[in-house]
């Protein structure tokens, strides 16, 4: 029996929030791993330290830029799979990646910068709606160009939302009172960043995820806001005072608050008021679910996540 070689993976945006987990997991999983890095990134002390870590994993650094077509094309010609984890300000620049993939003609799979909620199902308000629309546009362009793809839907980053339980500017879970978005009943989904990377790298060579949307829905992590608060209360042996932020309150803040806050709250409205994270079924043949495809992966549960905060 011939063991097929693991694909060569290029990660664009590898020094970003979720990108660094993907670079590490890809390299440690035995994939020849490449990271497209801007030369200016080396001048950032924090990013420079991260790049040294990448080198220790055996990652090949390719200097270039998503807006420089020549460097992009040169990088893409060296690999089999391209994963983009660029931030919101660069979503539209992924058009350049699509053009380069089309010109190179060697890419077996493209994973665009999704790594959030399913934008084809979400009913977001502005300013999140425009952000989601950019992702939708990139999806339709990939499909129109006939580029093989996988869209990765991981829902909430656990380390982003859970440490402060969605309490603005807090660093740890609340001990006295908690603000709950909406009535706290719609379910949402939380996945640890390391697990997101594991499921994603598992999927890159899997024919079952080709031209599919990969949904991450760990059963133990599909919880309502009220259920998470209750879980936390059980851990600390204390009942918290609960303040419910109504839909009207959220909409008012979204209209009047500063932009970063408005965007985050607009996403919270989609997830915690509309229930857009978990209010639909994963529909085959276009949708597949990660924990069903990869049952051997042991994911971190929300319950386990909070043990370190007790």
Swiss-Prot record:
It is an enzyme of class 1 (oxidoreductase). InterPro entries: NAD(P)-bd_dom_sf (IPR036291), NmrA-like (IPR008030), NmrA-type/Isoflavone_red_sf (IPR050608), PCBER-like (IPR045312). Induction: Induced by methyl jasmonate in roots. Down-regulated by auxin. Accumulates upon the removal of flower heads and young leaves. Expressed in roots. It is found in: Cytoplasm. Pathway: Alkaloid biosynthesis; nicotine biosynthesis. GO terms for biological process: alkaloid metabolic process; nicotine biosynthetic process; response to auxin; secondary metabolite biosynthetic process. The active site is at 135 (proton acceptor). Its EC number is 1.3.1.-. It comes from the Eukaryota. Keywords: Alkaloid metabolism, Cytoplasm, NADP, Oxidoreductase. Involved in the biosynthesis of pyridine alkaloid natural products, leading mainly to the production of anabasine, anatabine, nicotine and nornicotine, effective deterrents against herbivores with antiparasitic and pesticide properties (neurotoxins); nornicotine serves as the precursor in the synthesis of the carcinogen compound N'-nitrosonornicotine (NNN). Probable NADPH-dependent oxidoreductase that binds NADPH in vitro. Does not seem to be involved in the NADPH-dependent reduction of phenylcoumaran benzylic ethers. Monomer. Belongs to the NmrA-type oxidoreductase family. Isoflavone reductase subfamily. Root cells silencing A622 exhibit inhibition of cell growth, severely decreased formation of several alkaloids, and accumulation of nicotinic acid beta-N-glucoside and N-methylpyrrolinium cation. This is Isoflavone reductase homolog A622. The lineage of its organism: Eukaryota, Viridiplantae, Streptophyta, Embryophyta, Tracheophyta. The gene is A622.
């Amino acid at each position: 029996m011939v063991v097929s070689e693991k694909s060569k993976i290029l990660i664009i945006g590898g020094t970003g929030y979720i990108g660094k987990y993907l670079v590490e997991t890809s390299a440690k999983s035995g994939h020849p791993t490449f990271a497209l890095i801007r030369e200016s990134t080396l001048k950032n002390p924090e990013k420079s330290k991260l790049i040294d870590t990448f080198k220790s994993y055996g990652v090949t650094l390719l200097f270039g830029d998503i807006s420089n077509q020549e460097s992009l094309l040169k990088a893409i010609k060296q690999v089999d799979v391209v994963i983009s984890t660029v931030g919101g300000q660069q979503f539209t620049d992924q058009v350049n990646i699509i053009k380069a993939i089309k010109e190179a003609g060697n890419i077996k799979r493209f994973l665009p910068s999704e790594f959030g909620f399913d934008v084809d199902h979400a009913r977001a308000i502005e300013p999140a709606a425009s952000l989601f629309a950019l992702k939708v546009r990139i999806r339709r362009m990939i499909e129109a160009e006939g580029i093989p793809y996988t869209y990765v839907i991981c829902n909430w980053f656990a380390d982003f939302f859970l440490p402060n339980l969605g309490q603005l500017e807090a660093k740890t879970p609340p001990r006295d009172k908690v603000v709950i978005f909406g009535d706290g009943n719609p379910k949402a989904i939380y996945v640890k960043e390391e697990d997101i990377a594991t499921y994603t790298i598992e999927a890159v060579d899997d024919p079952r995820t080709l031209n599919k949307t990969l949904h991450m829905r760990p059963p133990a992590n599909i919880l309502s806001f009220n259920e998470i608060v209750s879980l936390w209360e059980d851990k600390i042996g204390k009942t918290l005072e609960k303040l419910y932020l109504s839909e009207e309150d959220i909409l008012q803040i979204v209209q009047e608050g500063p932009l970063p806050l408005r965007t985050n709250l607009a996403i919270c409205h989609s997830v915690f008021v509309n229930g857009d994270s978990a209010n639909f079924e994963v529909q085959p043949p276009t949708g597949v679910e990660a924990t069903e495809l990869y049952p051997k992966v042991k994911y971190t549960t929300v319950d386990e996540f909070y043990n370190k905060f007790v």
